[in-house]
Amino acid sequence: MEFTSVNKIFEAAFKKNWLRPAISNYQGETLHFRDVARRMEKLHIMFEECGLQKRDKVAICSRNQANWAVSFLATMTYGAVPVPLLHEFKSANIHHLVNHSEAKILFVDEVIWEGLSESEMPDIQAIIQVNTFKILYAADPKI
């Protein structure tokens, strides 16, 4: 097999399977490849607006769900580095790991967000609610 970039492999897979189911929430919503691609595109726009650069880190701290995978894929295809964090970690551990990883963006469940403080993560540019992709915090008020 000829080597190609990961993005080219994903692009071919998404085009080929556009109308097929891709990922599902347990006993819930099923996302088709087209849905995943559109959500990834929206996240790429958000990443750009937040000033995310290639090789920057993006932490993801959420229960297993379809949007966790979308966040991971969007981060990877943008050229950033996904940093998965267990949702069972205590707030202090999440703060420490986000800071230690030098993450610029953090995806979180709303329940996890309730126990966190953006002031404990000074390098974070944005915190995004993983279920809805709503921006919960942005260092730049214009975002």
Q: How should these model regions be labeled?
A:
Residues 9, 50, 77-143:
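Structural core segment of the AMP-binding/adenylate-forming
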Residues 2, 11, 19-69, 73, ...:
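Conserved AMP-binding/adenylate-forming core of the ANL superfamily
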Residues 1-2, 104:
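A general boundary/transition motif marking the beginning of the first structured unit of a protein
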